[in-house]
Every structure is written in structure tokens, then in C-alpha cells.
Swiss-Prot record:
GO annotation, biological process: actin filament organization; actin filament polymerization; actomyosin contractile ring assembly; brain development; cell morphogenesis; dorsal closure; histoblast morphogenesis; larval central nervous system remodeling
Record key words, sorted: Actin-binding, Cytoplasm, Cytoskeleton
The gene coding this protein: chic
Protein name: Profilin
GO molecular-function terms, A-Z: actin monomer binding
Subcellular locations according to the entry: Cytoplasm, Cytoskeleton
Free-text function comment from the UniProt entry: Binds to actin and affects the structure of the cytoskeleton. At high concentrations, profilin prevents the polymerization of actin, whereas it enhances it at low concentrations. By binding to PIP2, it may inhibit the formation of IP3 and DG. This profilin is required for intercellular cytoplasm transport during Drosophila oogenesis. Function in neurons is essential for adult survival, and is important for climbing behavior and activity.
UniProt GO cellular component terms: cell cortex; cytoplasm; cytoskeleton; neuron projection; perinuclear region of cytoplasm
Subunit structure: Occurs in many kinds of cells as a complex with monomeric actin in a 1:1 ratio.
Origin species: Drosophila melanogaster
Any single Pfam family the record assigns to this protein: Profilin
UniProt keyword Cytoplasm present: yes
Amino acid sequence: MSWQDYVDNQLLASQCVTKACIAGHDGNIWAQSSGFEVTKEELSKLISGFDQQDGLTSNGVTLAGQRYIYLSGTDRVVRAKLGRSGVHCMKTTQAVIVSIYEDPVQPQQAASVVEKLGDYLITCGY
């Protein structure tokens, strides 16, 4: 399965995620949904935020030019929200899964889809 297949068939097909991308820890995008124009700089800031959440707390999470309010996170997961949209991201051994979800999808629904894929990638060494 290609990286694009993971985005299309695992994340978007769940209908719990409306936009998504998978990138390496260097910020290079491996696959992304159509119209989700997240930049390498935005991804780099997000990735550094997994280890140092202070930057996300003060500056929020910016994806595709949209700034989201940082809600919570760990060294593996980052959550953010803006109005009716939410962000759920997961860091694996070599990759970061970034997802956007929209109302009426609940945060737990998006989290379940993203983390299931993330856990699978970890078992595969990614």
C-alpha cells in the first residue's frame, strides 16, 4: 500500500477525517489529501511541538495557513481546535500523521482513526 493509499483509504474513507497528510520527521510530505496545502515549515513547527509543547501553547498549530488553538498533547499526540474544526496529529517512529476533522465528527472519532493507523505504522517500523 502506498502512502497516498493510507491517506485516501484509511483516513479520508473513514469519513471522520476531512483533510490529512503523512510526513516524515524532517517535514517532507509523503502523501496528502487534495487541497490540503500544508507547508514543510508548518510541519516542522508541529513536529518540534511534540517534544516542546510550549511553542504550541503560545503560538497554536498552523496548518495550510490556518491557525488552530492548541488544546493538549503528549510526545505522541497533538490536539487543536478552531470553531467547528479540529486537529488530531500522531507522531510515529518515522512519520507524523496530520488530520483535520469537522463537526459533527467528535474528537474521539478522529483520534481513533488516526491513532489506529499510527499504531499500525509503528508495528511496521514507521
